[in-house]
């Protein structure tokens, strides 16, 4: 290559060029223009003044790709082109610059590829720097790689500076739309040649890549494939390949980089299109999502029943179609002289609904058994509506104090009008409880009045309403369901752990219900509930049996107060405070002593670890805590009589809070300890933990004076 002067001497006044885009070309005496290229050329030529008659070798540009946002500007009048003194200046073919409105081609010399358009830097004096590593023609000399790298770096700087000129250059070109048509035809012919000769990239360096120009006003850049040079002498190409083998390697690397950039630009343009379509797709998807719930709601074809007398039909053969199932169901009922108004099949075809004309037909249909439709024995029952649970509760009774060995058949003999009987059991063992459901609420009320206190295998049963009716009953309610200040239930405490319900039944002969709470191991918790048919019976038992000895222990009896009774102690909570404990009492023993308790904690000395004689017992609900408190009032645990009280709720200074306060003379920590006690929220152990915090807070500058209370 010809080494171009980077800081040439000041040249004569340059010749001003016509409005861009135009090409710069020098006359070449030694090169000939091919006829095809002369036909293709449509741009204007500007001759750069030559100095000292020296001829510079023609430079050829390698492939270049310009991003849509980057424009290439030809030399402007402010730019002075300089050639190396002492050498003959040769024509430097300019690379064809294409705009959406006008295409300009530049004739190239024979044996040389068209050069890249000279890039001008406004206001900068010096030699015009050609594009990336140009190759010499027939008279070109090979240059060192260092000089080539310097040329590339300066060219990159010029390219960056020319970005500001792009908009001014594009607009004049857009006004000449008349010249665009011929150029476009030539470009189409040359595009075909480009496609055929893609495999000759390494041998033919005269090939140029597509240049993209961005139209003004933000329009999408049009891609135009420039013309490939024609009629290049093969012998000269081979000579150039031998001479510039090293340059080809560098050019190929640069070409690959340019191609990668072009591919990235195309990918960005392709990615923009789906983004525009996304809103529409989202709307369609949202519409589908909105429609989905409606489809889910419609589980049955024609969900609206035609009559008020409906029957649920289950276990249908879902392998059949809905019309087939409708016909089959209608035929089955028609054979039994039942007229079907309509049949509605579920979407899964596993169930359906049948509408009848009258309640009589519906009742007759419910009495049918063993009906088969397409080989499946269908299930018939009344449909379950929104209020079905409420209705079932109103016509259902709870029977308690049943013999543990009683069966459904035996109960069926007692409750003749019962529609369904469900025995309650746990781990395979009966709990002496059953639910008796009737067809109507009137039947349930009638049975409640007539069968209350009926004996079964020597045990007097107790009946209760379920649902809303049962909420108005006494805790151990009976026939008189509302509280009138006269309880019918006795709470028995200090009961021997070996005592059973059968043992108590022998003592309290008039009792209608007896319950001895047991722990997980089946061991008695030391208290019981004894219910009578009337307040008089309960009061009589209280007066005659209180402090009576049963299996070696003197029992204590008291009337049970109702939930929310004015006689109940104020501010109940879920936690009981228990004091008077033996030092030998463990947390497990304390927990087992209270029916329904979920955990228990005993407060211990932080230094010795021995019990302080009090603790806390937690329950799931206030009701459970109340019942346990009444049962264990003045009771004994491990031989010690205990005293019960409600644990103070948060904000009222629980016992643990006081412990924390005493331990926290260390300042702030002590205060935190007190609040920790309040945080016990009646759960005892947490209050003790507050005391522990008080001790820790007391540390620091002073020796802790509180005692650590450790739980769990």
From Swiss-Prot:
Composition bias, Basic and acidic residues: 275-302, 699-712
Modified residue annotations for Phosphothreonine: 69, 76, 84, 92, 99, 106, 113, 121, 214, 303, 369, 407
TM helices/strands, residue ranges: none
Gly residues: bias regions: 652-698
Record-listed cross-link Glycyl lysine isopeptide (Lys-Gly) (interchain with G-Cter in SUMO1), residues: 299, 326, 591
Ranges where the record places region 8 X 8 AA tandem repeats of X-T-P-X-K-K-X-X: 58-135
Family annotation (InterPro entries): Nucleolin_RRM1 (IPR034230), Nucleolin_RRM2 (IPR034233), Nucleolin_RRM3 (IPR034234), Nucleolin_RRM4 (IPR034235), Nucleotide-bd_a/b_plait_sf (IPR012677), RBD_domain_sf (IPR035979), RRM_dom (IPR000504), RRM_dom_euk (IPR003954)
Residues bearing the modification N6-acetyllysine: 9, 15-16, 96, 102, 109, 116, 124, 320, 350, 379, 400, 405, 429, 446, 469, 479, 515, 523, 574, 579, 648
Modification sites for Asymmetric dimethylarginine: 658, 662, 668, 672, 675, 681, 683, 689, 693, 696
Biased composition (Acidic residues): 24-43, 145-171, 184-211, 234-274
Keyword terms of this UniProt record: Acetylation, Cytoplasm, DNA-binding, Isopeptide bond, Methylation, Nucleus, Phosphoprotein, Repeat, RNA-binding, Ubl conjugation
Ranges annotated as biased composition (Low complexity): 56-107, 122-137, 172-183
First and last residues of every Sequence repeat: 58-65, 75-82, 83-90, 91-98, 99-104, 105-112, 120-127, 128-135
Post-translational note: Some glutamate residues are glycylated by TTLL8. This modification occurs exclusively on glutamate residues and results in a glycine chain on the gamma-carboxyl group.
GO CC annotations on file: cytoplasm; nucleolus; ribonucleoprotein complex
Subcellular location: Nucleus, Nucleolus; Cytoplasm
Residue intervals of the RRM domain: 309-385, 395-468, 488-562, 574-649
Residues modified to Omega-N-methylarginine: 696
Cross-link Glycyl lysine isopeptide (Lys-Gly) (interchain with G-Cter in SUMO2), where in sequence: 299, 326, 372, 379, 515, 579, 591, 626
Sequence segments annotated as region (Disordered): 1-305, 642-712
UniProt function note: Nucleolin is the major nucleolar protein of growing eukaryotic cells. It is found associated with intranucleolar chromatin and pre-ribosomal particles. It induces chromatin decondensation by binding to histone H1. It is thought to play a role in pre-rRNA transcription and ribosome assembly. May play a role in the process of transcriptional elongation. Binds RNA oligonucleotides with 5'-UUAGGG-3' repeats more tightly than the telomeric single-stranded DNA 5'-TTAGGG-3' repeats.
Subunit description: Identified in a IGF2BP1-dependent mRNP granule complex containing untranslated mRNAs. Component of the SWAP complex that consists of NPM1, NCL/nucleolin, PARP1 and SWAP70. Component of a complex which is at least composed of HTATSF1/Tat-SF1, the P-TEFb complex components CDK9 and CCNT1, RNA polymerase II, SUPT5H, and NCL/nucleolin. Interacts with AICDA. Interacts with APTX. Interacts with C1QBP. Interacts with ERBB4. Interacts (via C-terminus) with FMR1 isoform 6 (via N-terminus). Interacts with GZF1; this interaction is important for nucleolar localization of GZF1. Interacts with NSUN2.
The protein, known as: Nucleolin
Lineage: Eukaryota, Metazoa, Chordata, Craniata, Vertebrata
Gene that specifies this protein: NCL
């Amino acid at each position: 290559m010809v080494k171009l002067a980077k800081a040439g001497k000041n040249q004569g006044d340059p010749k001003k060029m016509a409005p861009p885009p135009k090409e710069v070309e020098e006359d070449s005496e030694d090169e000939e223009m091919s006829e095809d290229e002369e036909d293709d050329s449509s741009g204007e030529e500007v001759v750069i003044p030559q100095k000292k008659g020296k001829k510079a070798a023609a430079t050829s540009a390698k492939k270049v790709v310009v991003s849509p946002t980057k424009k290439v500007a030809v030399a402007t009048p402010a730019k002075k082109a300089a050639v190396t003194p002492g050498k003959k200046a040769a024509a430097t073919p300019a690379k064809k610059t294409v705009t959406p409105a006008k295409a300009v081609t530049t004739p190239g010399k024979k044996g040389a590829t068209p050069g890249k358009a000279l890039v001008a830097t406004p206001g900068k004096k010096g030699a015009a720097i050609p594009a990336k590593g140009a190759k010499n023609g027939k008279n070109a000399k090979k240059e060192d790689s260092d000089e080539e790298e310097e040329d590339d770096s300066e060219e990159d700087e010029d390219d960056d500076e020319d970005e500001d000129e792009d908009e001014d250059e594009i607009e004049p070109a857009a006004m000449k739309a008349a010249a665009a048509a011929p150029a476009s035809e030539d470009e189409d012919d040359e595009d075909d040649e480009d496609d055929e000769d893609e495999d000759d990239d390494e041998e033919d360096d005269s090939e140029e890549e597509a240049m993209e120009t961005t139209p003004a006003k933000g329009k999408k850049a049009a891609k135009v494939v420039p013309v490939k040079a024609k009629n290049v002498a093969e012998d000269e190409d081979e000579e150039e390949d031998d001479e510039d083998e090293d340059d080809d390697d560098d050019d190929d690397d640069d070409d690959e980089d340019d191609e990668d950039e072009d591919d990235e630009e195309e990918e960005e343009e392709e990615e923009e299109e789906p983004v525009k379509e996304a809103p529409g797709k989202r709307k369609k998807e949202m519409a589908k999502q909105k429609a989905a719930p409606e489809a889910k709601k419609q589980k049955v074809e024609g969900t609206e029943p035609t009559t008020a007398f409906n029957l649920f039909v289950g276990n249908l053969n879902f392998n059949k179609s809905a019309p087939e199932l409708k016909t089959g169901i209608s035929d089955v009922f028609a054979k039994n002289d039942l007229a079907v108004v309509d049949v509605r099949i579920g979407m899964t075809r596993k169930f359906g609904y049948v509408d009848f004309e009258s309640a009589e037909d519906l009742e007759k249909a419910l009495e049918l058994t063993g009906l088969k439709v397409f080989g499946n024995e269908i299930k018939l029952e009344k449909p379950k509506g929104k209020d079905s649970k409420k209705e079932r509760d109103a016509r259902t009774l709870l029977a308690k104090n049943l013999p543990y060995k009683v069966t459904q058949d035996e109960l069926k003999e007692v409750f003749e009008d019962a529609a369904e009987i469900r025995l309650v059991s746990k781990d395979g063992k009966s709990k002496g409880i059953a639910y008796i459901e009737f067809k109507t609420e009137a039947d349930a009320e009638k049975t409640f009045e007539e069968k209350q206190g009926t004996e079964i295998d020597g045990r007097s049963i107790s009946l209760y309403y379920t649902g809303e009716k049962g909420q108005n009953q006494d805790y151990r309610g009976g026939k008189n369901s509302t509280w009138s200040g006269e309880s019918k239930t006795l709470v028995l405490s200090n009961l021997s752990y070996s005592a059973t319900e059968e043992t108590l039944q022998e003592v309290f002969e008039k009792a209608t219900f007896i319950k001895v709470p047991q722990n997980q191991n089946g061991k008695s918790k030391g208290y019981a509930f004894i219910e009578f048919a009337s307040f008089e019976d309960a009061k009589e038992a209280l007066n005659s049996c209180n402090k009576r000895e049963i299996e070696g222990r003197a029992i204590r009896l008291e009337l049970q107060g109702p939930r929310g009774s004015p006689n109940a102690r104020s501010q109940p909570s879920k936690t009981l405070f228990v004091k008077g404990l033996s030092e030998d009492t463990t947390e497990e023993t304390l927990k087992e002593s209270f029916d329904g308790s979920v955990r228990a904690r005993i407060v211990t000395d932080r230094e010795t670890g021995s019990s302080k004689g009090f603790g806390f017992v937690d329950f799931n609900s206030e009701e459970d805590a109340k019942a346990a408190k009444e049962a264990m009032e003045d009771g004994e645990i491990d031989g010690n009589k205990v005293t019960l009280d409600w644990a103070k709720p948060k904000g009222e200074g629980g016992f643990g809070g006081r412990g924390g306060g005493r331990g926290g003379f260390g300042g702030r920590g002590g205060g935190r300890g007190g609040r920790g006690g309040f945080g016990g929220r009646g759960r005892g152990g947490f209050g003790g933990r507050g005391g522990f915090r008080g001790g820790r807070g007391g540390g620091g500058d002073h020796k802790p004076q509180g005692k650590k209370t450790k739980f769990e």
